[in-house]
Amino acid sequence: MVGLAPIKVIEDLREQVRVTLQTIESHLQTTMNIFELTRTLISIPSISGDEKAVAVFLADHLSALGFQVELQDAAEDRPNVYAHRGDPDVVLSTHTDTVPPYVEFREDAEFIYGRGACDTKGIIAAMIKAGEALIESNVTDFGLLFVVGEEAGSVGARVANSIPNRARYLINGEPTESKLALGSKGALRAILRARGRAAHSAYPEMGESAIEKLLDVLNDLRRVEFPRDETLGATTMNIGMIKGGVAANVIPPEAEAELMFRVVTSNDSLKRIIEGVVDSRAEVEYTFGCDPVFTERIDGFNTTVVAFTTDIPALTNWGKPLLFGPGSILDAHTPGERILKAELARAVDVYKQMVVSLKASWS
């Protein structure tokens, strides 16, 4: 008759099995290919303000890959993720947040679809896989920085700028159609508020229409030839929102418009132009602004310029900036957001080679 195994032996066996299963699970997690990793990231919603779940996943995943990982609270329950090998002189960076609404993952033979596919869950995946390839090539002293809130004022980047580092170069990832961006336009958001005097619409002479005052100001702004830059092109203005009035039979006492300028010169110079046109006809409130950015070049790349803004203006302490990423900004923020699988796969090697090239350029 065979004796029963001691209880401690059984418990030890159970623990060994548990550890083995955890090891297998960790291995499966860390050996995800670029498309599997992108799918996993898209499946974790991270609309601006709710990035914690994807940050926790990234921290666990990067720790399992052998990175030293730091979580930095940019705001309550909104952690930035900084992962590094050694003391980085080159850092790959992009953002974890997306715009609303959430769009579920799907794919076909050519494309991956879903919220963040190109802006920027796919780019996160490409940067991580590039990091794996660098580790396999025994490259050290590089890092990955994934920040919250790029889509809503760059709060994560502004807080991450305080992380002590000695980085010489920052490779920022945004969808540039796999071209090296030579620069990106700045932005200036303004609210114009016109004041009038309410009256019965049958007696308009007794009132003053705030809407008509506002329309006059907007028409004058539309006729302005705003500054141009040889590289970035023209400053543009979008009248994004207009509201005002009480009812059709009331002379409107208040009206306002929200404008977004894509800027190729300094915000200060553009503000002087705006205020000169508006004069005293309306109040002007500036709610957001960042100057244009001119980025570094690397030989051998097709180049472009982009009209959108990035986290680069807020990451001034992370070295000289570069801007590159797979995917098209024209697909970002749309119901059919997507990224081409072949382009995403190529980006892994491009990011790796960029890190190697930049490290060699100054060593």
Can you say where each PLM-predicted feature lies in the sequence?
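Active-site metal-coordination/substrate-binding segment of hydrolases
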Residues: 86-146
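Residue-level marker for buried hydrophobic side chains located in beta-strands
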Residues: 90-92, 171, 197
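Metal-dependent amide/peptide-bond hydrolase catalytic core
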Residues: 46, 53, 73, 175, ...
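N-terminal helical capping/dimerization or prosegment-like subdomains
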Residues: 17-91, 99, 254-260, 272-276, ...
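Acidic/histidine-rich catalytic neighborhood of metal-dependent amide-processing enzymes
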Residues: 125-189, 229-230
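Extreme N-terminal basic, low-complexity initiation segments
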Residues: 2-7
